[in-house]
């Protein structure tokens, strides 16, 4: 593939690939309700997922590691630990904020500076899980549970490669492997509803690519049907299996992509009620309302979320994401002073990674310019550039150092 064609493919598929790899927002994809119920119905694992769904990753990891000690040869138990270690890091650096994947090139610019020890652990866990599944499949190629477990491991490896390493082709390889394994599961066991989630997501993604890119993908043997993808996700979501939550979240994201906001809101509000301590599900309601153009309702939703955070409802909230969303909604309403205050809160949050802080500082500068506070704007642009002089945000800030921002 020529560099030009690769660039076209990357631009066309950026949002969609991002959605493929982060559809779960950190929700379990590692065990199938249709498979053997030996390891994952014990108290430790149940407690682990309760913490996981609440974004309490350290507590979840403690429980899953104890469960793995009791079941060292279970690939699903290894996947639970792998899943938690990976998503703890992604959440730490705000790489699970779905709204950001609508930004051109974001998935390739988002920085997740993992410690090398964590990277090694992720690699070791994924290789361990793959080895356990492969050994079972050597003994019985039709071992459906092993195929399912291997597909989960492959999907997690794909997520790591694209978001952390920014390795497009490596991620694509493992994503296709995950799809293939779960398609095999469905051939052997059509009633295995949990396998429909990955297959459904991939069908939607490939089916949504631009026609030229889809033709290129077809030549490479990669096919998809957008409507089939939505149908499979709806079926997996209604089945009530272990990927039901994942399927519903993916469905909501894709419905949002299709402009079917009200349908997506119904799903997200159900998830918000089902997981009352999950900060990201609560935030997604505000994101959807903002995307639909209901800015006043979006601002109200985010304010309620921030109030709940102050009262301890969400134990591991990243307030900077919520403040940034609030800033956007107020900016869209023309409430510039309120927007400026929200962006300032986003930039000063203790949990804000440098790239998110830079984004908030750039927004601060733009609002200051709109309010005719030129000196404040210059300070904010310079502060943004100082965080990372090579980013797109820095390039934009430099432009406004020379000429004030006047609005889009």
Regions found by a protein language model. Give the residues of each.
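Terminal, low-structured helical/coil segments at or just beyond the last alpha-helical repeat
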Residues: 370, 376-408
């Amino acid at each position: 593939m020529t560099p030009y064609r690769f660039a076209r493919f990357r631009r066309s598929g950026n949002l969609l690939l991002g959605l493929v790899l982060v559809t779960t927002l950190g929700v379990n994809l590692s065990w199938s309700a249709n498979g053997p119920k030996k390891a994952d119905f014990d108290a430790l694992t149940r407690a682990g997922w309760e913490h996981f769904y609440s974004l309490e990753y350290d507590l979840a990891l403690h429980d899953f590691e104890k469960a793995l000690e009791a079941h060292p040869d279970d690939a699903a138990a290894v996947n639970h630990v792998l899943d938690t270690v990976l998503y703890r890091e992604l959440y730490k650096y705000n790489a699970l904020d779905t709204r950001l994947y609508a930004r051109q090139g974001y998935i390739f610019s988002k920085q997740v500076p993992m410690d090398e020890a964590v990277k090694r652990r992720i690699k070791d866990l994924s290789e361990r899980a793959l080895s356990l599944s492969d050994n079972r499949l050597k003994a019985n190629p039709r071992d459906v549970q092993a195929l399912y477990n291997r597909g989960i491991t492959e999907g997690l490896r794909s997520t790591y490669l694209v978001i952390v390493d920014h390795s497009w082709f490596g991620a694509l390889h493992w994503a296709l492997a995950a799809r293939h394994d779960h398609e095999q599961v469905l051939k052997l066991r059509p009633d295995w509803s949990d396998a429909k989630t990955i297959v459904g997501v991939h069908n939607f993604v490939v089916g949504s690519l631009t026609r030229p890119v889809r033709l290129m993908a077809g030549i490479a043997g990669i096919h998809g049907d957008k409507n089939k993808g939505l149908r499979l996700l709806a079926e997996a979501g209604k089945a009530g299996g272990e990927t039901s939550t994942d399927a519903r979240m993916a469905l909501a994201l894709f419905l949002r992509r299709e402009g079917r906001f009200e349908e997506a809101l119904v799903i997200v509000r159900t998830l918000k009620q089902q997981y009352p301590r999950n900060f990201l599900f609560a935030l997604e309601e505000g994101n959807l309302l903002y995307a639909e153009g209901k800015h006043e309702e979006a601002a109200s939703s985010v304010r309620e979320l921030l109030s709940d955070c102050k009262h301890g409802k969400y134990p591991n909230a990243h307030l900077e994401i919520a403040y940034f969303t609030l800033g956007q909604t107020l900016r869209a309403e023309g409430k510039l002073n309120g927007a400026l205050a929200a962006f300032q809160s986003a930039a000063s949050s203790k949990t804000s990674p440098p790239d998110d802080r830079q984004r908030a500082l750039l927004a601060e500068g733009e609002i200051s310019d709109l309010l005719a506070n030129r000196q404040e704007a210059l300070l904010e642009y310079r502060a943004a550039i100082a965080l990372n002089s090579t980013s797109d945000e820095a390039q934009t800030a430099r432009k406004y150092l020379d000429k004030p921002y006047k609005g889009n």
